[in-house]
Amino acid sequence: RSLQADRAIVDALKRAGARVTFGSGHLLTVGCAEERLRGFEFDATDCPDLFPALAALAAFCEGVTVLRGTTRLTHKESDRAATIAAEFSKLGVSIDLSQEDRMVIRGLSTPDDGLTVRDASLDSHNDHRIAMATAVASLRADRPVTISNAQAVDKSYPQFWNDLKQLYY
């Protein structure tokens, strides 16, 4: 049991239809419990640092995801709500911020869909969590993507790029 607010990611994954199991040594394994992940509702007010990762998850869920708590995002390393919407839109992900304190994300229609890149030049805005979330979302892009200021990940996860390469390639 973690005291970290970010542990709520487990609940979000389950709401999306993921199967989450815990192993020894704090190992967490995530797989699809259903044929495809589905849009979900989640209140991230108490865990605002999860928004970038939740946006990446929602991009690959069928249907609409509603994340609450966006007012907590304006004073992070970047205005995270606006940054997430701007950078993910370059990947073809529709994010609506017009509802008060909500981020509404329209996911891909089928699990075989890839992201249709509109602009292959993303920017982390020197925000480590934005850099990691856009990198993960870019794995399903229909063409190569570059992320400016990608070294921002060094703030919290210096091994991120090596670990992502090992997991994905």
Residue spans for each PLM region:
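Short, structured segments at the rim of ligand-binding sites
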Residues: 1-169
